[in-house]
Amino acid sequence: MGKFQFSKQTHNIIHLKRSWQRPVPRHETLHKNMKKVMFLLAVGVMCLTACAQKKGGERGTRQGGHMVINKDSDSTFVALKNETLKKFKQLTFNDTQTGKTMEYNLLVPEGAEAGEELPLVLFMADASTAGKEVTAPLTQGYGALEFASDRDQQKHPSFVLVPQYTDWAVQDDWSTTDEVEMTIRLLEKVCKEYNVDTNRLYTTGQSMGGMMSFYFNITHPDLFAASLFVSSQWDTTKMKDFGRKHFFYIVAGGDQKASGGMKDLAEVLKENNARVDSTSWSAKLPSEEQERLAEELIAKGGNINFIKWEAGSVLPESGKGMEHMASFDYGYKIAAVRDWLFKQSKE
């Protein structure tokens, strides 16, 4: 068979094609590579956001550990902040056991100087406030401020103790830093210095703070008269005796880690023959309706109360954000829950 020959027309086409296969200029290559990098970064951010939403709790939001929801447009919150911030002193605790210091906020109620023993609320914020100014746990949301409000202080005069943490105090593997037990020593110091009714100590916190409240109920089982756990969870294998405790546990249905913790605790309590009263409603209901529903739950007379916000209801109308962080304030806005807390006593 003879040698294959290109036709003249085919040869010209190949020559023309090769003439267009010029080297790509470097600036075009860099531009294409940059577009690829930007695309991969965008995909990575989307994956991290989805992962954080799925994980919920403190570890799940660590990528946004210093993210704080701006509430300047919430006129009710701004008014509450203006009403209450001036009531707090900013102080420093020197811990002789560790040699470390801890900054904290303290509200001393009217009547305390007259010798009357009054209850104390220990409020611990989430990790978004860690490492910031001492007042960050106050200004981040409704939590501590509701207990300091004129309404609450007139109805339930109480000390309000709000520590500030330098870093994440607890982790999702249940490990803790020195600042966790430092908090208890700070509490003991305040109780010695002021006329605190030690039969009416209450612990509460959101996310990291709620995890610490769970931890304290395990490691110091007889210290607190009652607790309010918000958007948090802990190792339920250590909670077999929680049936004898008095607490409210409030989470968002779409916060998978916290709602999962609630489910796990319910199972542990059931296995140990403890009674749990629970309910669920939309966080978008009018406040009057939410108060009524909370009072119906309390009227059942149980010592353990669960509230789960319907999934998605804690999010803004846009539907954007994470249910974990968006749920914090809702847990503290219910006056009936706070009133119930102050009725609990170890006596």
Describe the function of each predicted region.
Residues 120, 127-181:
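Active-site machinery of serine-nucleophile hydrolases
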Residues 192-193, 199-243:
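Primarily recognizes the serine-hydrolase "nucleophile elbow" in alpha/beta-hydrolase
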Residues 51-120, 204, 211, 265-267, ...:
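A domain-start/cap signature at the N-terminus of enzymes
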Residues 111-116, 170-207:
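Gly/Ser-rich "nucleophile elbow"/oxyanion-hole loop immediately N-terminal to the catalytic nucleophile
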Residues 139-151, 230-239, 290-293:
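Alpha-helical scaffolding within the catalytic cores
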Residues 249-251:
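Short beta-strand/loop motif that positions the catalytic acidic residue
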Residues 253-259, 275-347:
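C-terminal catalytic histidine-bearing segment of alpha/beta-hydrolase fold enzymes
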Residues 1, 5-59:
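Bacterial Sec-dependent N-terminal signal peptides
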